[in-house]
Amino acid sequence: MLPQRIFFTGVPGSRWSGIAQTLETIPGFNTSDRTAERTYNHHSYSGHKGAYFGWGMEFEPIVLWNNPDHIDQAWTEPGGTRLVKSHNWPDKFEKIEKRFPDDWIMLVYRPDQAAFAWWHEAGGFQIKYPDYSWYVDSNTMMYEIARSNKLMLDYACQKHATWNYFTTDWIKENFGADIEVSTIHSDILVTLIK
């Protein structure tokens, strides 16, 4: 059975948004957080869709601990599993576990330099949504990518989590759904902490 929420994270450029959109095709996922204002397209990709939680965004992570209903305000329809997306979750894993013990945490890992390069290719600081201005410049972005990746790797190790490629079989094993993954990237790994 799917949880009410999955706290979903990856560094900028990890291609986590494509993984999120694939997961949200699983029956039972709530995508009513999608609006025209919460969409960014680049190249031939659908880019970013739905609410993104983060510093300087519509939904800042700090508010979540004082008012968990703040999360659910991003969705216009009740019910279903909500994919709660933020680049900032690596700083908050322990708080998430305490505040939302029945929800899951999903991590998307891509090596620092590959993620940094793809983020720039996708638009870098010109990306309109989500807002990356709090990263200030490319040096800070690279530092934050490396820091967040290390936090994710450390957390996964602490939880004895297993990293896998994002494949059709992985989705079936973890979500019980037959969803086709059209492209498997050899430098992108995922893990799910239930």
Predicted segment positions?
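PAPS-dependent sulfotransferase catalytic domain
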Residues: 80-183
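PAPS-dependent sulfotransferase catalytic core
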Residues: 1-76, 182-187
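Compositionally biased amphipathic helical and low-complexity segments enriched in hydrophobic
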Residues: 65, 154, 190-193
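Structured mid-to-C-terminal alpha-helical surface segments
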Residues: 177, 186-192
